[in-house]
């Protein structure tokens, strides 16, 4: 059943599909306003009615794509299975045929276009749906526009301009280039992710906030008018043990729930992770990963044990730890046994320098269970294995990576031999970085890292977020944080 705006979207999309003048449809909506639900229902009907032949569902990240794919597939019935062959899921990188390339100058992994996209070159009667468009960088938008200008492409952009933009950009180019009074631009403004009237009201207050006004009283009004107490306001005290937010948070942990505290600064998240871990473990000695810790993945990770995938922001709980000491890689294997040229000798000199660096670390082999994921079911009891550099060795590990990186960069600047240096960078990534999960403790993260995720219970450090001097960015961060909650939302204020 569609609401009024969703039905308008259905009518306008049908009109959009049946015309050839305009190539872009903007479906803009509040966080949790039902954009994906609306598009999935409408485009499914387009396929059934043979108005289109195929749909490419795309997103900027693997995590966002998996969330999208999981939702779309859950709405395909057994009788609709023949439609599955007409629905493709891919990242925008794949759509554009971007491939990961290691830059020989710096060793950084970047995505670059390697050839013309076969998906967009032969796109007649195919539709492209791009979700989370607030996260699309200017480079990606420029590349998409090249194809839009060349081929009969029709794209639906879905997103929310009040969400945080790509890192380093003031606003996503998608939103800043929407023409005035454009006929294929619809805003969904009723929040559907949560059934909580309170959370919807808070998101609305933040979204419509005039930054010259004080917001506290408007939030207090929402709190005072609440009948469900899904929205709470807490005062931050110097003695956190006496704070009602802290007692509430710990109670949820003890009930095996997965609450999260959202902040602006990484240092503030570190503070919350530390005080919560000290309470849970009843110890000041928390310099390592411990049983019952909640962990969150900072990046995609494939376990070397069984290639099990974990996505950015997936959360796990440690149930067992084992520690081994290991030399990460024996660099002497790369020595040229019979150097014949000056280049060979200089290369061997580089390898010897790298070999002298401390390359022995303690590795935690952690048995974990999933407790939160927007991609994979976290209700199962399966035990997974992940490898991490021991917490107490992390600084030394990062220093080693930095030193090796500098040595390889220096060698490249001097000799400019791409083949040799590319091989070294490959070892650097596959032997030293990729086998080990990049994780953080999972009780608190920044609002930026939370984008695209949904949590049952969210606590927001309003004081920390409002310390951002960029008021527009601050508003988007606060709005993003509030929109992560599905059942309970708490604002922590002075």
From Swiss-Prot:
A Pfam match: AAA_19
Disulfide bond positions: none
Lineage of origin: Viruses, Varidnaviria, Bamfordvirae, Nucleocytoviricota, Megaviricetes
Protein name, as recorded: Uncharacterized protein R530
SUPFAM superfamilies to which the protein is assigned, alphabetical: P-loop containing nucleoside triphosphate hydrolases
